[in-house]
Design a protein with these regions (language model features):
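Short amphipathic alpha-helix segments
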Residues: 4-23
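Short hydrophobic/aromatic beta-strand micro-patches
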Residues: 4-6, 35-38
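C-terminal basic regulatory modules in eukaryotic proteins
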Residues: 20, 36-62
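Short Gly/Ser/Thr- and Asp/Glu-enriched loop/turn motifs at secondary-structure junctions
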Residues: 27-32
Length: 62
C-alpha cells in the first residue's frame, strides 16, 4: 500500500509512527511511503495518525 502525503515534511514523522506500532514502512521519496499491512490495520493506524496530526493529509493508493 502506498501512502502519499500532501506535505512531504511529515514523511519521517509518519514513518516513525508506523515503526512505533510494529510496521516496517519504506520511504520511497519525500511524501511517499510504502507499507505492507492489511488494509483494516493500516486504516486504524492512519485514523490515530490523523487525530495526532490533523493538519497532515494522507492519501492511500493500492
Amino acid at each position: 500500500m502506498q501512502l502519499l502525503l500532501r506535505d512531504p515534511e511529515y514523511t519521517d514523522r509518519l514513518a516513525a509512527f508506523l515503526r512505533s506500532v510494529g510496521q516496517r514502512p519504506l520511504v520511497r521519496e519525500p511524501g511517499q511511503i510504502e507499507v505492507d499491512a492489511p488494509d483494516e490495520e493500516l486504516d486504524a493506524y492512519l485514523r490515530v495518525w490523523i487525530v495526532l496530526h490533523p493538519e497532515a493529509h494522507v492519501e492511500l493508493q493500492a
